[in-house]
Amino acid sequence: MRTLWIMAVLLLGVEGSVIELGKMVFQETGKNPVKNYGLYGCNCGVGKRGKPVDATDSCCFVHRCCYKKVTGCDPKKDRYSYSWENKAIVCGEKNPPCLKQVCECDKAVAICLRENLGTYDKKHRVTMKFLCKAPESC
């Protein structure tokens, strides 16, 4: 089942260390990250760029900008460690500096998505790229 979930995430193109990011989003929001955020708005998912459609989509925009600041590793592929302690994400102490940055980016987007659950709109669950307005710069 885990392999099937990973394949689904890869096919939809969710950025970040797929397993960790997906777990964080689920832990913080209680939502399936692939179904609910894989194609959401103009910034959630790979290859999507554009003016955010709402606060939820803005979380993904900020996440993309956070990844642009990471140097020394591939935030889309390299894995890191983290734990879920007392309903809070804790990035692993033994992560190298680059992966600590990636973990913090992923933690921030997961928390942002939780904090903006009230702005989540099912009509934006599948937004086609051509409908997005010119992207904003970080």
Curated annotation (Swiss-Prot):
Site (Cationic membrane-docking site (MDoS)): K129
PROSITE patterns documented for this protein: PA2_ASP, PA2_HIS
Disulfide bonds: C42-C132, C44-C60, C59-C112, C65-C138, C66-C105, C73-C98, C91-C103
Signal peptide (UniProt feature, chain positions): 1-16
Tissues where the protein occurs: Expressed by the venom gland.
Origin superkingdom: Eukaryota
Region (Important for membrane-damaging activities in eukaryotes and bacteria): 122-133
Keywords linked to the UniProt accession: Disulfide bond, Myotoxin, Secreted, Signal, Toxin
Predominant location category: secreted
Compartments where found: Secreted
Cellular component annotations (GO), alphabetically ordered: extracellular region
InterPro entries, per the entry: PLipase_A2, PLipase_A2_Asp_AS, PLipase_A2_dom, PLipase_A2_dom_sf, PLipase_A2_His_AS
A single GO BP: phospholipid metabolic process
Function: Snake venom phospholipase A2 homolog that lacks enzymatic activity. Exhibits potent myotoxicity causing myonecrosis and edema in the gastrocnemius muscle of mice. Is also able to stimulate the release of IL12 (IL12A-IL12B), TNF-alpha (TNF), IL6 and IL1-beta (IL1B) from human monocytes, and induce IL2, TNFalpha and IL6 release from T-cells. A model of myotoxic mechanism has been proposed: an apo Lys49-PLA2 is activated by the entrance of a hydrophobic molecule (e.g. fatty acid) at the hydrophobic channel of the protein leading to a reorientation of a monomer.
Family, per entry: Belongs to the phospholipase A2 family. Group II subfamily. R49 sub-subfamily.
Oligomeric form and interacting partners: Homodimer; non-covalently linked.
Record-given protein name: Basic phospholipase A2 homolog promutoxin
Natural source organism: Protobothrops mucrosquamatus (Taiwan habu)
Classification of source organism: Eukaryota, Metazoa, Chordata, Craniata, Vertebrata
